[in-house]
Amino acid sequence: MIKWLQRAGCLSAHAVVPQAPAAASVQGRHDLAFDTISNARDLGGLAGAGGRRVRQGRLYRSGNPALASAADLERLQTLGLDMVVDFRSPGEKSPEEAAFGQRFHWVAAPVLEGSMAMDVLMPRLRASTPAQMDAFMLEVYGDFPVRYREAFAGFMRTAQGGKTLLFHCTAGKDRTGFAALLLLAALGVAQDDILANYLESNQRNAQFNQTALARMAGLGVAPAVMTPLLEVRASYLDASMRAIDAGWGSVDNYLRDALEVDVAQLRGHYLAG
């Protein structure tokens, strides 16, 4: 699946992904006006199978919404969400988030359980080089379709029910990005558009990332070491695709055989036109 890298103009695993989103993604996205929920967007508008487009107002992705402002929570409630799917592990959550679960049907589907907790990450970050952190992220993405297959299968089963969904992790880029790949691939969205949607996180999280770099520098983590953890890179998504190709031969096979997705049913729910 090296074409994912070539199309993004990113032939090196260490190359920095361009910050500007691709035109196809700009045309297909529907921005959400949140002040305290990062990386939030509607997947509606992207071109899918058979000349149809992904329905707006049905599939949303974001960073963690659970500590949002009161105004943003009110805005979130207007979306008519049937369910909010959280890919974070228990160690990434705080007690202050409990109130969110009282307002929304909030379902845990933990991926990378334990791996992203700060007490686990900090020793790794302090001991690693930028190249080692890049390799760590490639390993993480390679694990998504294999080690965490059941979590993503459960997510796809939920989507197959035709629910209006918001799905998120912490920054809405890695676990959420892979989940978006699965959904959009099942809906027949072109690989270029899937990749462009994935890479948008760099622009959308730019302020979040700068704040994180400054905070972590104060804790003894060099910006160059932290950057691979904060960015999305075409090479990361390619690691997932390579794992899928190695185990199942194609994304279509993975969706059908590993996740048992009914693609026709999904398209009936989420494609318009």
Swiss-Prot record:
The keyword Ribosomal protein belongs to this UniProt entry's keyword annotation: no
Gene3D superfamilies: Protein tyrosine phosphatase superfamily
PROSITE patterns, sorted: TYR_PHOSPHATASE_1, TYR_PHOSPHATASE_2
An example molecular function term from Gene Ontology annotations: protein tyrosine phosphatase activity
EC identifiers of the protein: 3.1.3.48
Enzyme superclass (EC): hydrolase
Catalytic residues of the enzyme: 169
Leader sequence segment: 1-15
Designated name of the protein: Putative tyrosine-protein phosphatase H16_A0669
